[in-house]
Amino acid sequence: MEEQKIRIRLKSYSHEIIDVSAKKIVDTVTRAGATIVGPVPLPTKKSVVCVIRSPHRHKDSREHFEMRTHKRLINVVDLTPRAVDALMRLDLSSEVNVEIKL
């Protein structure tokens, strides 16, 4: 029989919130009896936007804003039905985007 595993990918703009959410997932799944690999930090994506400060002229005066997207990867190996049930009931922050692949 093929080994069942779940790959959970987390994305957030705040690294503190994503770390707290990853810790919640790891604690919940290990208490349910599944083996876990991670959380593995993936490269942070940085997007920079350049905006002209003045509404009319002075094009040389610009302001730069950046937005960083932090990512974490968690692999759940040796999956149990209890672990899947615990993951479904888990309440995470709305600031964290969760992608789950089987």
Swiss-Prot record:
Keyword Chaperone: no
Highest taxon in the source lineage: Bacteria
Pfam family of the protein (one): Ribosomal_S10
InterPro entries to which the protein is assigned, alphabetical: Ribosomal_uS10, Ribosomal_uS10_CS, Ribosomal_uS10_dom, Ribosomal_uS10_dom_sf
Cysteines engaged in disulfide bonds, as pairs: none
GO molecular function terms attached to this record: structural constituent of ribosome; tRNA binding
Keyword Metal-binding: no
SMART domains associated with the record: Ribosomal_S10
Keywords in alphabetical order: Ribonucleoprotein, Ribosomal protein
Biological processes annotated in GO: translation
GO cellular component: ribonucleoprotein complex; ribosome
Function: Involved in the binding of tRNA to the ribosomes.
Family: Belongs to the universal ribosomal protein uS10 family.
Subunit structure and binding partners: Part of the 30S ribosomal subunit.
Protein name: Small ribosomal subunit protein uS10
Protein source organism: Tropheryma whipplei (strain Twist) (Whipple's bacillus)
Lineage, uppermost ranks: Bacteria, Bacillati, Actinomycetota, Actinomycetes, Micrococcales
